Amino acid sequence: MSSSDTFQNPKSLMILPFMGKFYDTFAEPLAWVGFRALIGLALVYESIAKIEAPFAQAGFVESIGFYPGWFWSPFLAYLQFVGGIAIAIGFLTRPFALANAVMLAITLWFHVAHPYGDAFLTSAGMDFLKSAPQDVFTPAALSLFKGGGTPFLEQVQEKAELLSLMWTGGALFLAAFGGGPWSVDRLLIKREF
């Protein structure tokens, strides 16, 4: 397999044809490594708390229909951790990326189907903000707490949905195209799943 199997850079279509070899042999492979590392290491980072407490999400996974929680909670934690490492180095990239993409798609569904509430501040919290807000928060921060924090929660909800969409898309991309030319799959195994 060559580094240009996935995407082609024909000289006839390039404005700077002499750059084709650079793109094929360096820029494209390096971009694959960077993208794989971004997706994989983000999965590892997000899994660390789950690895430290593997049964902590048992109730949550059961609440969305995955029984028994004592199985699914640690399974998903280790899938995210081991899969993240495998994706980052490009080992069995497609199956690990697909498995994590399914998990991330469920996360996306959860964020869309179960939005944050209208407010997160209690009446005591609102009273505190009214008593001495200038000592604690900037005017811009205070604007997020109007109506019990609705503007703040709207921002949190939007970020949760967009990040879930981005990570799901990244994992699906790697599941579809593999780990790229500088991956364990291609360099050592010489095959892809």
List where the protein language model places each region.
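Extended, low-polarity transmembrane helix blocks
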Residues: 2-52, 70-78, 82, 89-193
